[in-house]
């Protein structure tokens, strides 16, 4: 399955919620009505969605939100299932621990896609070492930073300014002047803030 390269707002409308695929510079909420799906008949109400349909839709939504394809998403679920604790919460923690997501959460990229590009282009270091793997799992205590030669990029400064205005999550501590941040702790489930029902995903894979 190839990565989706079409309009990002269309994906958010399809899922009925903001997937945070667009920069805060032009919020999807200002341009799209999430209660209608894309297409000519998007506003028409259809038959009740089956339990399987709801579970599948939730999985698709989370995959698109984090930019993860099916095979890799399945591996995350299997890893979450093998850990102690709640499988759904474990799954979200693994997704949140991805380097591209941490870069996004720290405000170095205005979207996860932009953060993924920064990682792939070797603009990011972890504990002083260059890491260009977006799926790299950041650990508690890791220091994530923008490389010195990349700090001059205007998009990074703009993203940091926006993130500072919106506010950053409690599990990261960012020094905006140095463009570096500490991954302080594993986020609690109620700190994610996203409209996710991970239990539906667990039910889907448990079939």
Curated annotation (Swiss-Prot):
GO biological process: ribosomal small subunit biogenesis; translation
Positions of region (Disordered): 30-51
Alphabetized GO MF terms: rRNA binding; structural constituent of ribosome
GO cellular component: small ribosomal subunit
Domain S4 RNA-binding intervals: 97-157
Alphabetized PANTHER family for the sequence: 30S 40S RIBOSOMAL PROTEIN, SMALL RIBOSOMAL SUBUNIT PROTEIN US4M
General function of this protein: One of the primary rRNA binding proteins, it binds directly to 16S rRNA where it nucleates assembly of the body of the 30S subunit.
Family from the record: Belongs to the universal ribosomal protein uS4 family.
Protein name: Small ribosomal subunit protein uS4
Naturally occurring in which organism (per UniProt): Verminephrobacter eiseniae (strain EF01-2)
């Amino acid at each position: 399955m190839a990565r989706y390269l079409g309009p990002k707002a269309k994906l958010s409308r399809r899922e009925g919620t903001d997937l945070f695929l667009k920069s805060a510079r032009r919020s999807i909420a200002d341009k799209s009505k999430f209660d209608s799906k894309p297409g000519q008949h998007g506003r028409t109400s259809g038959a009740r969605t089956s339990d399987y349909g709801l579970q599948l839709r939730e999985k698709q939504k989370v995959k698109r939100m984090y930019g993860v394809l099916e095979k890799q998403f399945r591996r995350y679920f299997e890893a979450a299932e093998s850990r102690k604790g709640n499988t759904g919460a474990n799954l979200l923690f693994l997704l949140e621990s991805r380097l591209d997501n941490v870069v996004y959460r720290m405000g170095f990229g205005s979207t996860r896609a932009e953060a993924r590009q920064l990682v792939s282009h070797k603009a990011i270091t972890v504990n002083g070492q260059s890491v260009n793997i977006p799926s790299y799992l950041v650990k508690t205590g890791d220091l994530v930073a923008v490389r010195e030669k990349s700090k001059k990029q205007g998009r990074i400064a703009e993203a940091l300014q926006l993130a500072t205005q919106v506010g950053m999550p409690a599990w990261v501590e960012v020094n905006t002047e140095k463009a570096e941040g500490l991954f302080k702790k594993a986020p609690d489930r109620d700190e994610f803030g996203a409209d996710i029902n991970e239990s539906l995903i667990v039910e889907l894979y448990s079939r």
